[in-house]
Amino acid sequence: MQRSPLEKASVVSKLFFSWTRPILRKGYRQRLELSDIYQIPSADSADNLSEKLEREWDRELASKKNPKLINALRRCFFWRFMFYGIFLYLGEVTKAVQPLLLGRIIASYDPDNKEERSIAIYLGIGLCLLFIVRTLLLHPAIFGLHHIGMQMRIAMFSLIYKKTLKLSSRVLDKISIGQLVSLLSNNLNKFDEGLALAHFVWIAPLQVALLMGLIWELLQASAFCGLGFLIVLALFQAGLGRMMMKYRDQRAGKISERLVITSEMIENIQSVKAYCWEEAMEKMIENLRQTELKLTRKAAYVRYFNSSAFFFSGFFVVFLSVLPYALIKGIVLRKIFTTISFCIVLRMAVTRQFPWAVQTWYDSLGAINKIQDFLQKQEYKTLEYNLTTTEVVMENVTAFWEEGFGELFEKAKQNNNNRKTSNGDDSLFFSNFSLLGTPVLKDINFKIERGQLLAVAGSTGAGKTSLLMMIMGELEPSEGKIKHSGRISFCSQFSWIMPGTIKENIIFGVSYDEYRYRSVIKACQLEEDISKFAEKDNIVLGEGGITLSGGQRARISLARAVYKDADLYLLDSPFGYLDVLTEKEIFESCICKLMANKTRILVTSKMEHLKKADKILILHEGSSYFYGTFSELQNLRPDFSSKLMGCDSFDQFSAERRNSILTETLRRFSLEGDAPVSWTETKKQSFKQTGEFGEKRKNSILNPINSIRKFSIVPKTPLQMNGIEEDSDEPLERRLSLVPDSEQGEAILPHISVISTGPTLQARRRQSVLNLMTHSINQGQSIHRKTTASTRKVSLAPQANLTELDIYSRRLSQETGLEISEEINEEDLKECFFDDMESIPAVTTWNTYLRYITVHKSLIFVLIWCLVIFLAEVAASLVVLWLLGNTPLQDKGNSTHSRNNSYAVIITSTSSYYVFYIYVGVADTLLAMGFFRGLPLVHTLITVSKILHHKMLHSVLQAPMSTLNTLKAGGILNRFSKDIAILDDLLPLTIFDFIQLLLIVIGAIAVVAVLQPYIFVATVPVIVAFIMLRAYFLQTSQQLKQLESEGRSPIFTHLVTSLKGLWTLRAFGRQPYFETLFHKALNLHTANWFLYLSTLRWFQMRIEMIFVMFFIAVTFISILTTGEGEGRIGIILTLAMNIMSTLQWAVNSSIDVDSLMRSVSRVFKFIDMPTEGKPTKSTKPYKNGQLSKVMIIENSHVKKDDIWPSGGQMTVKDLSAKYTEGGNAILENISFSISPGQRVGLLGRTGSGKSTLLSALLRLLNTEGEIQIDGVSWDSITLQQWRKAFGVIPQKVFIFSGTFRKNLDPYEQWSDQEIWKVADEVGLRSVIEQFPGKLDFVLVDGGCVLSHGHKQLMCLARSVLSKAKILLLDEPSAHLDPVTYQIIRRTLKQAFADCTVILCEHRIEAMLECQQFLVIEENKVRQYDSIQKLLNERSLFRQAISPSDRVKLFPHRNSSKGKSQPQIAALKEETEEEVQDTRL
């Protein structure tokens, strides 16, 4: 960054903001970069501001029982705030004085006051000086208040972040990431620009009192008629505001539904295309959009009338003020024009300034109170440690994550045990964790000496992580004692990578020791990985380490923990993402050798680790199931250990699979069972349909108290994203950082908010910060958005001046129309993270405007209609001017004096009432035309938004995956949320305001030109100057806003990153370092924002200066060239004041339109995306309520045979595939043939291309070559018809928000009887029947109430309903329990007995059922043969599979000679037989 010119700027340069000229000049000539931005003044640095506020807040905490944050803010900023407030008041006072001078100038042209004609020139000078003084007072005052607001925001930003790092885990479990981000964005943003409004809470009443006194002098008691009307108008607008809020709240739910479906569609676009659901999803979203638009129109109409009421209230205010006085005493024109000027200022004070000031104080105090409550939350308390101790001891320790929930948990458990019925499923496999109670540890006792290894095992949710958290102090024990030295190192179950180099992530602030560093790198098997990078360990890792694989991230996290020299190492499942060989090597070299003399607590479910541990602690439901050595485990729990040991392949299973087996074993041999139970009996009981699970599931949904989730770290299924291989391990951070979780309202809420709507009961969950830290969220997590129309805070009144525009309307371009709730503004959340679609030109092109206007043909006619109405209004204005200036009337009190044609006095004789009738009639006509002129325009612009949304949705659904792969999900969702909200809410009224302001300016100039042609000559160069100044400023301002948006992203990214690694930060004591990084991010954003505010003030002040020069010219031209007659000079000066203030407003409004039109540009960019495959001849799947043929098949063979494919024979010739056009081939020359009904297994190492081949068969990639199914080539039929030939069970399960019926049959092709039949076949009937509404039960949140196994069965049911002849399965058994796995195997044998099956699977027992195997190595087919030939050790088969697969496939070669076959096979067969009599 460059050194700021502000530091050396003179007082004059600071006053006129001339120091910003270099950046404006550079931005106009070239594109600005971050290096061009000026450094911030030291007074604005986050370090200084946070230290200042933190000192005052600590003082407040120490001195009072009820500390108030506002007191700390007052001591920091109050006097500067009041200083600028006084300047603002003085500037407002000048606005009240100006009409007095205007009245004196008009009076000097009265024929009876010729003696005052000589002082008219001096009055004109005084009037011009008032404009100059107002300019010099208001702009520095407004900028100073904005500056103070910015400093307050920065200080509170830092205070909140520091507090976040200190919060206890219990508090973090109650606060969502959405609430935290909202606290930093939505609430604190109120201070930046709203602070200038705060002073009007006292300025406006003083101004009203002053104005009423001046108007009283002119009109006496009739002045209160106008004031009364303004008060009624304010109340009327408040009523409209409440009506608008009602429509907004109704509309919010509809927008939320649409965005939920849209976000799920975007996240699972590959599955949507694989299922051929594009048209079903489009129809579903468009139906929701139709309902939403009905409420959008109602809200827009109310906002329009609210805005129009202000526009046209000026006439009534003047008319009601003048009429009573005129009827009684008569009135001169001087009083009319003076009253007009007074009423303009009065109207702004009563209907705008004061209500907005009250609202600003209300919002600001509410935000301060929320922040104050947050700053007083319970903090993390480190346990009292004994630095001299060498052992780790726990004595009778009991703990709850929810304070005070112990008794509630026991009561809820007892209640549910009393309500057991016989209609449910007791299998724990389907829930993965208990749905009851809080995570709890009960009566834990153990003692480990220095240098010992304690292995902690247990089923999912048993309390293993909670145990480590209690040792770290994150979880406070409610009973018992904990003893250790306090020097702890920690490795989280889910690897956390901070932005920085690999070396920085491992050292993590600890002093560098070369020998220790190299030893750790070697022990953690990172040497080979680091050597592959050109920068070695100095390579910079992105957010969350997205450039690394899951295994690399896990090893770096482990290396970080090992590198720190500590007394106690807490390792929470560090091997989750490692293959068998790497895991074994790291355990031996690192855990057992390098750390041999250290005390270690290792959470693991691997039998090999239990054997080598000094002590073993097995947890079950929070209690100690066993504590002792491995030999004691074998002696005391022979059944437990023998069952695990009997599975020779147990150690080779994935962590999830081991957890599943361990869970079931623990259940069968729980301490609760007093009597011995045989294996067979226990197994049968475990699969018996008792109804306990069903009742628990219902209670967990229907009863919020029973739905307190159990804290457990549930490993996520590796995501398959955009056709990448199955272990691509799409990092969770990429989704969470872009789309923060939504949350309703208050800081502390129940864990589940339940919305029950009869049969369509919906259970919605949120993601707390603690969930974010543990990543224990549902895979199908969707984005809940509650979108509402933004309330127009600004009505662009033509009478308003520059200052009013600046204070009240600059926020226009930042208003969003998006909210999740009153607490969380979704637009603020979205703007917290930089949008990669912002790579559009800085200024909207004319082509965008032309395309926008021609989207809907009616828009052109509506614009013509607006022009016709405008011409009629100009004619009406000329009639009014004729009445005011050219009607010969007589004064009631001076009827004896003769007058010429320019008599300026109106009398109230009976004959003269007709003048008022004409005036009122013309004004009413003008008012009516004005009220309804913009209504067709607003209506049509909303229709344009509807059309653009439809086109964009269709374009995204039809776009090829190669295009969608290059876009972030958050960026796509921004178009459907942020940009569509702008098109719906902001753009229509902003365009209407701009057109109206522009036409008003043109009309007023035309009137003035008729009255005084010389003024028209002066107007032309002023308009040219405005246009040039706008173009000059716009280039720089848009770029600065872009840089500011980019600078905002690191702040919130750093917040999310810190929260994810908070336990690690605390364990390593790195909070100060991360506070420093946060302050750097704040300073970067401040530099951009401060420069934007400064350049904006430069622009506003230059506009004001041009206006002042113009008004000086108009004043002196009028005084010097106008003859006798008050009417002419009064009209000229009054219109001149309004012309220029309106022209300023029009210029600024055009900038707002340009800014909002960037959203239109982004929408057009999506509409112009390429379309995949051949266009279909029929794009409407529904006709007259019935499903029509979606695709017209062009192949003659298919036309003759309605049932295609009939056999399922597939021939692949020279198939090659690429992710993007021009990219590297990821599959090369793949050729093979499959006979009808044959099963083919795909084998190969991770990353060899197995899942990619399945995507290529579905034509989801850029492919070359030929594929034929039953003799029909894929080039001869349409794309969707080709995909309908396949049934798909993807690795990433897709459950969208909707009913069971919609999820199974989105096109509504099948009857309920057929759906229930398929549900019976796949074992889903009992699952569906336990929910209210059954098939009509609404699934939300990615089907959060279903287990992963249930979701896989849903996918299986879809394939059965599709009646496809070719089935593609991509890891269907990943993370499945044995029961669901056996159901899928059974269904495949029965329902797909005659189908061709292509299976990508890691479970060997499933692969052995295939007749042929396709071995893929290095993106090519290495072998395609039967299993008998592949078993030959000299074949390429053994080279193509991983070592772990080799162990599974050849168990007899890897076991001892006397060892029998794995008992897991027997278990599999017994389970399969049992399943025949068990419905799930």
Swiss-Prot record:
PANTHER family: ATP-BINDING CASSETTE SUB-FAMILY C, CYSTIC FIBROSIS TRANSMEMBRANE CONDUCTANCE REGULATOR. The modification Phosphoserine is found at S549, S660, S670, S686, S700, S712, S737, S753, S768, S790, S795, S813, S1444, S1456. GO terms for cellular component: apical plasma membrane; chloride channel complex; cytosol; early endosome; early endosome membrane; endoplasmic reticulum membrane; membrane; nucleus. This is Cystic fibrosis transmembrane conductance regulator. Glycans are attached at N894, N900. Binds and hydrolyzes ATP via the two cytoplasmic ABC transporter nucleotide-binding domains. The two ATP-binding domains interact with each other, forming a head-to-tail dimer. Normal ATPase activity requires interaction between the two domains. The first ABC transporter nucleotide-binding domain has no ATPase activity by itself. Monomer; does not require oligomerization for channel activity. May form oligomers in the membrane. Interacts with SLC26A3, SLC26A6 and NHERF1. Interacts with SHANK2. Interacts with MYO6. Interacts (via C-terminus) with GOPC (via PDZ domain); this promotes CFTR internalization and thereby decreases channel activity. Interacts with SLC4A7 through NHERF1. Found in a complex with MYO5B and RAB11A. Interacts with ANO1. Interacts with SLC26A8. Interacts with AHCYL1; the interaction increases CFTR activity. Interacts with CSE1L.
